[in-house]
Amino acid sequence: MTSNAELFSAAQAVIPGGVDSPVRAYGSVGGVPRFIEKAQGPWIWDAEGTRYVDLVCTWGPALLGHARPEVVSAVQVAASKGLSFGAPTRTETELADAIIERMAPVEKVRFVSTGTEATMTAVRLARGATGRDVIVKFAGNYHGHSDVLLAAAGSGVATAGLPGSAGVPAASTADTIVVDYNDVAALDAVFSERGDQIAAVIVESCPANMGVVPPEPGFNAAIRRLTTEHGALMITDEVLTGFRCSPSGFWGLQQQAGEDFAPDIFTFGKVVGGGMPLAALGGHADVMDLLAPTGPVYQAGTLSGNPLATVAGVKTLQLADAEVYQRLDVRSEKWRNELESALDAAGVTYRLQNAGNLFSVFLGVDSPVRNYDNAKSQNAEAYTAFFHAMLDAGVNLPPSCFEAWFLSDAHDDEAFEVFRAALPRAAQAAAQVISA
């Protein structure tokens, strides 16, 4: 088996849908998924030997580029000493220190293996801290696939056009209230009615799983104000944006813009593990100390804080200094400008939105995308045409119009030229669909 089609067929025989995460199956764009054999810097190679400029970057973790030598070397050294111990290691403390140094409101950190575990634990912790049950989330915000948070979620749920998931009992979401994103008045109304029952509001610091939809000025600060007034906690999900948008995530960008607020709990993932399976939650010591073994809120995991992932995380954060983010911001603007020029030349109606170096394009939309309903109004068929034209020209984009595009510190001039050359034909393909 050497072709992507043969590999996909074989995978479908033994793995549901042939993939281990739904968006990888190309369900919304059609065609055969590329089976990746290797990755280096800004490039990936599929099973047929075709090279692509990668704008997925492992869905975010590859901040420094694929297979950054220093990170690979650190993991190899760690692996030579043992893959996992089920016991504490010094690199857990080193990585916790690195997170605390970057995130001023965080005083203690607990490591888990996935973003879903991080948000699931954060919700349990908030309920344990407040003695309340109700959780408020926002439509289109994705917080992993735990039952309580799958209501009106983004990411793969949005890609599949699903309201939630089969197998989630009504009782699991009975205490979940979904509010339109960027609607302070709606959130205020929920607190006016049920404020004494709400344990926490959970929000993506900047949603990037319904496309990139930045919070309007003051929105996250309003969440902080309302939760404080009603004795609830604020959980800020930076699984995707943490250490990606800036050294302090999207929260750091908001601090720079003068929005001074501090959530009770953050969740982190992706970049913090340097490409290895690792996530975390962190926050005020009085809240975090409610976790077992010091408190009554239980959480555990055989591979939580495993040495390979923590070593990769430590090395990644060591290398991701301020200059890396400055280069990424400049590079992202250059690539966005080129994308805009191609779409303008083709007469495509679109909206391009970014959060620091993260960005995504909404085709067929001519006004700001500020919530999930706006995001769903984009022309998904136009994105499909655009996606395949780019793929045929050697550019790997997210196989869903609801996902963010990622660059890395390794995306160089050669990668940019491949991207630039692919754009005109892809833009024309999108234009033809929109005008049909």
From Swiss-Prot:
The answer to whether the entry has keyword Isomerase is yes
Q: Supply the SUPFAM superfamilies for this chain.
A: PLP-dependent transferases
Q: Which cofactor does it need?
A: pyridoxal 5'-phosphate
Using the record's annotations, give every residue carrying the modification N6-(pyridoxal phosphate)lysine.
270
GO CC, alphabetical: cytoplasm
Pfam families in the record:
Aminotran_3
Where located? Cytoplasm
The molecular function terms of the Gene Ontology recorded here are: glutamate-1-semialdehyde 2,1-aminomutase activity; pyridoxal phosphate binding; transaminase activity
**Assembly, per entry:** Homodimer.
Family listed: Belongs to the class-III pyridoxal-phosphate-dependent aminotransferase family. HemL subfamily.
- Name of the featured protein: Glutamate-1-semialdehyde 2,1-aminomutase
Q: What species was this sequence derived from?
A: Cutibacterium acnes (strain DSM 16379 / KPA171202) (Propionibacterium acnes)
